A protein has these predicted regions:
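Basic, Lys/Arg-enriched alpha-helical interface segments
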Residues: 1-72, 81-84, 94-126
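Conserved catalytic cores of phosphodiester-cleaving nucleases, focusing on short active-site segments
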Residues: 86-90
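Hydrophobic/aromatic beta-strand elements that line small-molecule binding cavities or substrate pockets
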Residues: 75-77
Length: 126
């Protein structure tokens, strides 16, 4: 018998913070598919090639951006915490000019990151 030396990584659960899941579910199916793939990679400890660090929150907070029929959709998630992926925010970019994220979305992501941290710490995991 040959031992299995290629152990598959354990899939981390996804926890949705606030209205992130409800908002994500309003995205077009093609956008959900691509973002779902990115989240699936995060669950396995990998990173989607288009995922980029979310500015201001460090390397463990990532953003995936998808364009679809002239609209731009974003999902921000964190892999800061062991054994879980938290989706902090999912939103459609409203501005038609520039790439800057509206301040209200930036603030919401910061607040939800704090909620994710509190949730993680309440479970006694580190």
């Amino acid at each position: 018998m040959i031992p299995n030396t290629l152990a598959m990584p354990r899939e981390k659960p996804v926890h949705w913070v606030g209205s992130a899941k409800k908002d994500y579910q309003t995205f077009p199916a093609a956008v959900q598919d691509e973002m779902g793939y990115a989240l699936g990679l995060a669950q396995l400890g990998a990173r989607h090639p288009h995922a980029k660090s979310w500015k201001g929150e460090g390397p463990g907070v990532l953003e995936i951006v998808e364009d679809h029929r002239g609209d731009t959709y974003r999902a921000v998630y964190t892999v800061h915490f062991a054994d879980v992926v938290y989706v902090l925010h999912a939103f459609q970019k409203k501005s038609k000019s520039g790439i800057k994220t509206p301040q209200e979305d930036v603030k919401l992501i910061g607040e939800r990151l704090k909620r994710a941290r509190a949730d993680f710490e309440s479970k006694g995991t580190s």
